[in-house]
Regions:
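Active-site capping/gating segments
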Residues: 33, 85-116
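Short, well-ordered alpha-helical microsegments
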Residues: 6, 49-51, 73
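Hydrophobic beta-strand segment of the Class I
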Residues: 41-42
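Conserved class I S-adenosyl-L-methionine
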Residues: 62-94
């Protein structure tokens, strides 16, 4: 995914005419950049090391984190009685927030986003579930190894039936 995303970002950058922007793929837990290097670091759906990011940001630089919250896809997790952060006491967003504050960031906003996505077909929803860790049973609090379980057909069909709307399956 990352190489393709960078390719798309570079195409968009070319169209924008801006010259002071570059994109890189790297391990966010082993960043290979000097201190005070970035104006902006973004992280989406990933584990972050806020202390390392803090060191790589220029003075006045910004960090934007968009992560999966405990309540993301909650109705699905409830139906299957498992899933990413299902058993966690703290939501992932709060875990990240505390780590960011501990790293030295001063102006921090925690803005919960809860988006309802709709899928045209049950095949589309199923494809998402087998490619993402939504129903994988693991804890964001303890970072334990997660267990990939098969998606039970009967439970999946029940979910589809209960969550099909005129907009699609939510």
């Amino acid at each position: 995914f990352s190489d393709k995303m960078i390719e798309t970002a570079n195409k968009n950058l070319l169209q924008s005419g801006r010259r002071n922007i570059s994109f890189r793929v790297m391990d966010n837990l082993k960043m290979d950049t000097p201190d005070n290097y970035f104006d902006l670091v973004t992280a989406r759906h990933t584990i972050i090391d806020p202390l390392q990011i803090y060191k790589t940001l220029k003075e006045g630089g910004q960090l934007i984190v968009r992560g999966v919250d405990k309540l993301d896809c909650w109705s699905l997790k409830r139906m299957f009685k498992r899933g990413q952060a299902y058993h966690d006491v703290k939501p992932i967003s709060l875990i990240d927030y505390e780590a960011i504050m501990d790293a030295g960031f001063k102006e921090v906003e925690l803005i919960p986003l809860h988006v309802i996505e709709y899928y045209k077909t049950k095949e589309d929803l199923y494809a998402l579930l087998v490619k993402t860790p939504i129903l994988d049973d693991f804890s964001e609090e303890s970072f334990n190894e997660y267990e990939r379980k098969p998606i039970e057909k009967k439970t999946f069909e029940k979910y589809v039936k209960q969550n099909t709307t005129e907009k699609g399956i939510k």
